A protein has these predicted regions:
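Short helix-adjacent coil turns
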Residues: 31, 35-42
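C-terminal-biased regions
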Residues: 1-30, 44-134
Length: 134
């Protein structure tokens, strides 16, 4: 265990990613309501915000991956090492925090993917219903 490696950068990167993924889920919830109301203009506005949020998430994910690779390098581990291997090399008192943050990133990632698919299905249904009534 190497306590000289700063784990704050990794924690900050994980928190940033969580915040942005949470923001996307909020936007997707709004979009779901908008789709059920069949509010085309509001949906277009939300689509742009969702695209922007996805770009932010991508940058945050890259930042987290960079922080993990950087920590692995400082700990003299391979760059492609798994997060749990890096966590084990940090002081024991920080393990629960890092494990919880990584777990929450995974949970929100799965939820985000589910919501994106759900909303895509609603959009397709909405477009089909709109085109068949015209």
């Amino acid at each position: 265990m190497d306590s000289n490696v700063n784990w704050d950068q990794l924690v900050d990167a994980l928190r940033d990613e969580l915040q942005e993924k949470g923001g996307l889920i909020r936007l997707l919830n709004q979009q779901t309501e908008t789709l059920y109301r069949r509010d085309i203009i509001e949906n277009e506005r939300l689509e742009e915000q969702i695209r922007t949020q996805l770009r932010l998430i991508s940058r945050c994910t890259q930042g987290r991956e960079f922080a993990l690779r950087q920590a692995a390098a400082k700990l003299e581990l391979n760059e492609d090492v798994q997060s749990h291997d890096v966590i084990r090399r940090f002081p024991e008192y920080v393990h629960p925090l890092l494990e919880a943050l990584f777990s929450e990133v995974d949970r929100l990632s799965n939820r985000m993917e589910e919501r994106l698919k759900q909303n895509q299905g609603l959009k397709e249904r909405f477009i089909f219903e709109t085109s068949s009534t015209v």
